[in-house]
Structures are given as structure tokens and as C-alpha cells.
Design a protein with these regions (language model features):
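Terminal interaction module
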Residues: 2, 26-39, 46-47, 51, ...
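Internal, hydrophobic cores of structured domains that mediate oligomerization or house catalytic pockets
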Residues: 98-184
Length: 213
């Protein structure tokens, strides 16, 4: 004899935000899903730190700049900032400065101002020690936060673990079994104070395989 089951489903969607990493880890740990929170991306944090150095010292006042990754390895990542000068046949990209995150033997990281062109960025040259300290501060602050994209990745992982699937023609809307809502709602309650809106609603199912990804 076939057993009865509740065929109702729930729809889920959310608006993500940049939040403290500790808040995300606490929320997902509450439902034993802390491994879904992506680890800090040292390279992207370094790119954002470089952008803050550019803003703090007016490096872009003389024209647009672009960050580029330096070849690195497991224990070091680096970013260089170059001036972007559009040309008729090719663009010119003169070097301005570079910073790196270097892993120490104790597992911690040290942020260094690796190189700079004193003629191109005299404000960096005059205050290179201050710039290095700022880069270290900016980088650590960035690592302590989870980006909106990373939070979306974590929430998506949670919904998938709860048996959810994406409804293609409803935008970024997911369907999940109603009996799996507890974990979603618990994470939603813990993240709400940080400006994250996780919304869910119950609706009867309507099967259409073209909507399922």
C-alpha cells in the first residue's frame, strides 16, 4: 500500500548582501551547514584592498586604472595596478604599484607593498610605509566580510541540500519541499539583522519539466 505524503512545496528567493563572515558562519552552523560558507578569497580581497588604496590616495585622479593578478602560488597572491590609456591600435598600461599577500610559516599572512613607480605615483612613494599598513588593514577587513555573491552561493547550497530546484521562468526563484523549510527559515532569521532578506511561501505544486534546471 502506498504511503501518503504531503505534496505541497514552497518557493524561496532572497536578496543577498555583504555581511560579516562571522554572522554567516554562525547562521549556517545553526543548521549544521557551516561548510557551505565559502572561505575567504585572498586574491579578491587583495583586489578590493588595492581599489581602496587607489581611492585613498587619488591614484585615479590622473586617469582610470585597472588591477591585474600577478602569477603566484599557494602561499602568495599579488595584484598590480596599472594606468589604462586607450590607444587607437592598442592600449597602453603603464605600471603604478603592486601589493601582495604572503603566507607566513605560522599560517598568518603579511601584506606588502611590493613595488611602485615613484615618478608615476609620487604619493605612494612618499608614504609607502603608510600605504603598506593601509593595504594590510583593508585586506584584513575584506577577509572578515562575506561578499553578496558568496552569500548567494551559500544560500543556494542550502536550498539544494534541502531538495530544492530552480524554476527557470520565475527569475531567481527556487522550489523546495515544505518539510525542509525549517533550516531555511532558521538561517533567514539569523541573517535578517544583517540586511539579508530570505523569503519563502507555500504553494501547491505544478509540474512542468521545462521549468526544472
Amino acid at each position: 500500500m502506498a504511503q501518503k505524503f504531503d505534496s505541497d512545496s514552497a518557493i524561496a528567493f532572497w536578496s543577498s548582501a555583504r555581511i560579516p563572515r562571522s554572522a554567516a558562519e554562525k547562521a549556517f552552523a545553526a543548521v549544521d551547514k557551516e561548510t557551505l560558507v565559502p572561505r575567504a578569497d585572498h586574491f579578491n580581497a587583495l583586489k578590493r584592498a588595492a581599489a581602496q588604496i587607489v581611492a585613498a590616495h587619488g591614484v585615479a585622479d590622473d586617469g582610470p586604472v585597472k588591477p591585474y593578478g600577478l602569477s603566484g602560488h599557494a602561499n602568495a597572491v599579488g595584484v598590480e595596478v596599472r594606468r589604462f590609456i586607450r590607444g587607437t591600435t592598442r592600449n597602453d598600461l603603464p605600471f603604478l604599484f603592486s601589493i601582495g599577500a604572503l603566507r607566513q610559516t605560522d599560517g598568518s599572512y603579511r601584506i606588502e607593498l611590493l613595488e611602485y613607480d615613484a615618478a608615476a605615483v609620487p604619493q605612494i612613494a612618499r608614504a609607502h610605509r603608510k600605504v603598506e599598513a593601509q593595504a594590510d588593514q583593508f585586506w584584513r577587513q575584506e577577509c572578515e566580510y562575506l561578499t553578496a555573491n558568496d552569500l548567494t552561493q551559500a544560500i543556494t547550497g542550502l536550498v539544494k541540500d534541502c531538495g530544492g530546484f530552480l524554476l527557470r521562468d520565475e527569475g531567481v526563484v527556487w522550489s523546495m519541499p515544505i518539510h525542509m523549510l525549517d533550516a531555511y527559515e532558521k538561517v533567514a532569521d539569523l541573517l535578517a539583522p544583517h540586511g539579508v532578506q530570505m523569503i519563502c511561501g507555500i504553494c501547491p505544486p505544478k509540474v512542468n519539466r521545462r521549468l526544472i534546471q
